[in-house]
Amino acid sequence: MKIKGVTRQWEGGGYYRIRQPLDELACHGHETSYEMANSDVTLDGANVIVGQFIGGQSAKAAVGISQTVIVHSWWRELYRSAAMVYELDDDPFEVEPMNLTYHVYMNPIAHDSIKHCMEIANLVTVSTDVLAERMVKINPNIAVLKNHIPESLLSVQRPHRDRLTIGWAGSQSHIMDIETCAYGLRKTMARNPDIDVHFIGADLRFMVKAPREIRHTVWCTDTLDYYKLIDFDIGIAPLKPTVFAETKSHIKCLEYAALGIPVVATDVRPYKDFVIDGVTGFLVRKDHEWATRLRELINDEAMRKEMGENARALASQWTIEQGYKQWEAAYQSVI
């Protein structure tokens, strides 16, 4: 196959959903390329084109409200010469007001545009089963391609600090999630003055109202370099259960696991489908359990080590070097 990817973002979803799988497919005899979304992108001879989040409303030319006619015309024109794959890893129809992209997606014009682009695709690929259950109403030809990691992540030696570190990484859209664990984290810091807390990405430290400073590191522009910033001994993955959050993937817990980090995560999809409670980490069902589970891990180094090793073993089953065949089969199905 000759496959071309068109991505809305270079890192994050762009890395996991477009660049990483296409790079791996290139290692197995397929000709692949990718570039940022724009309505002047051409096929360059590709027989499969994968478009991430095509359509909608934004200030960007590729998806702007004033450009919807151009985008739709461009997308339909590609249909004449290649199999069309619409790639989606979030539900654009259930974006929450706290999300910075709320004004971009939550309007009738954006919804109609996204639906139109999905409807004319030969295949829609999504990252989770829940997302597939929703999008199948728009296009019945759906393939679930769950997020994978590069095998090299399993051998990354994370930085180790003198003080035990509890950590979290995420974007501004997770503000409600941090709120769910803030009390437990604050209580844990008060009881354990000799530990550190480290946030990577959005600066949501103010949500915790911590008794002392929480260390903060801004996002790294390269996904592979971002992995090297993670110095956590314990990872947290809070997630407020909402209609939008239900479609999220397990990638945060998978990243922690690959680095041998036990996780304390909210007992909701997607995390409960990946984290093995009591084996690779803990699943929290009630707010007070955050402090309890963190205390157990802080006080038991042997448990942290065992859970971390179990987590890494689990993560080894989720490498793109094994999982690329799912992308290969999905794309071949529409040729």
Each model region followed by its residue ranges:
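Conserved catalytic-core segment of nucleotide-activated headgroup transferases in glycan assembly
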Residues: 5, 9-24, 148-153, 161-230
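Conserved acidic donor-binding segment of nucleotide-sugar-dependent glycosyltransferases
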Residues: 275-288, 296-302
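A short, well-ordered alpha-helix in the C-terminal region of glycosyltransferases
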Residues: 303-317, 326-329
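Membrane-proximal helix-turn-helix segments that form the acceptor-binding/catalytic region
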Residues: 74-78, 92, 104-124
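Active-site proximal beta-strand in glycosyltransferases
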Residues: 49, 79-96
